[in-house]
């Protein structure tokens, strides 16, 4: 006779996506009827995000080092096509934002405010910051979550250990597996964490402050939805020659939803790693491409930079030609790739892009202030697009290289997981 599963067993073996949806709905209900109670449970969200941020650096370090150290000479990692997809997707996102902003121009009511941050003086400063992050102290890189530095040191250690004894390589492999199990445990608490995040955010900010920027938000979110559901599928189809939507929807569901509420690409790295494992992608590939994508794959950031820059341009009545618009797309794409090297991320790169049109810095910083006001939606959607695209492009490159039937593979994996969940229940 099969023993009746306990409540904890049902929680651990249940559908994570369904539990997250329940957490979202419960958070909305609690914040609507009892804001005070909602604020009191917001610590669950902060605790969850902190746990993800804590485990992400060490996860990336040991996985990358282990993958490279144990890599066979004939192994193909497919990193080059993935990086090309990252850059292509970011450039397409910026170009799409230019076109949408041209057909649906946005004007802003600027308000004077004091932003306690200093934007970079130019693209060279952004690149300079990234270069210094590469040679950061390894301990400081782990403590501060500097994933560029972590990748550099992990790769260096991995290459150095390729000549080590097999026992040393096996020990490193065992450590990476142990950290991965810890990550799986943390991710199982995503429903509770997202419940706290939703309840706390709605209770604290509400959406009243966003009503004055509905057109701006519509343009921003419209661009991001267009990239997620039209442009990315076209790119994936061009790479795999298979139906891209099973992969697209699964990544949006299992990566994008979590990223939307954590609002942190770094915190979502463990979630993406777990999803890549479910998709049965090559571990040597995704252990490097996912943390790299969290650093340079910034389609959402390029959209934010472009849309808000052109909103400032339209507000001031500045005319621009197609050549300047193309240049803005390139600058926004390059700047977005360096957004992780700037405190404040994509918003503080807006003055850099505004400089192309001669927009005064005072006006540019007022646009940045508006960005912070709408950040509860803008930043969430931006992170969801950025993070889910990391898995999408990694999977597309892997499927193309191995000539796997992408759509059939995703559907088969989902069917097997459903049967496994049903059997456990």
UniProtKB/Swiss-Prot annotation:
Record's function text: Involved in the import of serine and threonine into the cell, with the concomitant import of sodium (symport system).
Classification of source organism: Bacteria, Pseudomonadati, Pseudomonadota, Gammaproteobacteria, Alteromonadales
Major localization class: membrane
Record GO terms (molecular function): neutral L-amino acid:sodium symporter activity
Catalysis performed (reactions): L-serine(in) + Na(+)(in) = L-serine(out) + Na(+)(out); L-threonine(in) + Na(+)(in) = L-threonine(out) + Na(+)(out)
HAMAP family the UniProt entry points to: Ser_Thr_transp_SstT (MF_01582)
NCBIfam families the record matches: PRK13628.1 (NF010151)
Keyword flag Iron: no
Protein name: Serine/threonine transporter SstT
Bilayer disposition of the protein: Multi-pass membrane protein
């Amino acid at each position: 006779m099969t023993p009746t599963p306990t409540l904890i067993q049902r929680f651990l073996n249940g559908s994570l996506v369904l539990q997250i949806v329940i957490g979202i709905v419960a958070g909305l209900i609690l914040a609507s009827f009892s804001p005070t109670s909602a604020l009191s449970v917001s610590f669950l969200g902060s605790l969850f995000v902190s746990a993800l941020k804590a485990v992400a650096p060490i996860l990336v370090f040991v996985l990358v080092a282990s993958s490279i150290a144990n890599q066979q000479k004939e192994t193909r990692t497919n990193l080059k096509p993935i990086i090309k997809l990252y850059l292509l997707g970011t450039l397409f996102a910026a170009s799409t934002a230019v076109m949408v902003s041209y057909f649906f121009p946005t004007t802003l009511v600027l308000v004077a405010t004091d932003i306690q941050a200093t934007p970079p003086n130019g693209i060279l400063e952004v690149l300079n910051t990234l270069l210094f992050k590469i040679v950061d102290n390894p301990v400081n890189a782990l403590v501060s979550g500097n994933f560029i530095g972590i990748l550099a040191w992990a790769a260096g250690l991995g290459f150095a250990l390729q000549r080590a004894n097999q026992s040393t390589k096996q020990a490193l492999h065992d450590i990476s597996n142990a950290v991965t199990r810890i990550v799986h445990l943390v991710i199982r608490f995503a429903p509770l964490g997202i419940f706290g995040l939703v309840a706390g955010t709605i209770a604290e900010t509400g959406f009243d402050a966003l009503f004055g920027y509905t057109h701006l938000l519509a343009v921003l979110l419209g661009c991001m939805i267009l990239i997620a559901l039209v442009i990315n599928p076209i790119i994936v189809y061009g790479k795999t020659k298979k139906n891209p939507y099973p992969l697209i929807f699964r990544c949006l569901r299992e990566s994008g939803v979590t990223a939307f509420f954590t609002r942190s690409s770094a915190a979502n790295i463990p979630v993406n790693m777990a999803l890549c494992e479910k998709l049965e992608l090559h571990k040597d590939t995704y252990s490097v491409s996912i943390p790299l994508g969290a650093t340079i794959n910034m389609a959402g950031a390029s959209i934010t930079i472009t849309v808000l820059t052109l909103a400032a341009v339209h507000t001031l009545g500045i005319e621009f030609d197609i050549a300047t618009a193309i240049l803005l797309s390139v600058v926004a794409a390059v700047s977005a790739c360096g957004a992780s090297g700037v405190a404040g991320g994509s918003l503080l790169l807006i003055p850099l892009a505004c400089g192309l049109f001669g927009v005064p810095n005072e006006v540019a910083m007022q646009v940045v202030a508006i960005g912070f006001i709408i950040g509860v939606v803008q930043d969430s959607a931006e992170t969801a697009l950025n993070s889910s695209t990391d898995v999408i492009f990694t999977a597309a490159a892997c499927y193309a290289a191995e000539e796997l039937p992408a759509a059939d593979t995703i559907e088969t994996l989902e069917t097997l997981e459903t049967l496994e969940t049903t059997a456990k229940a």
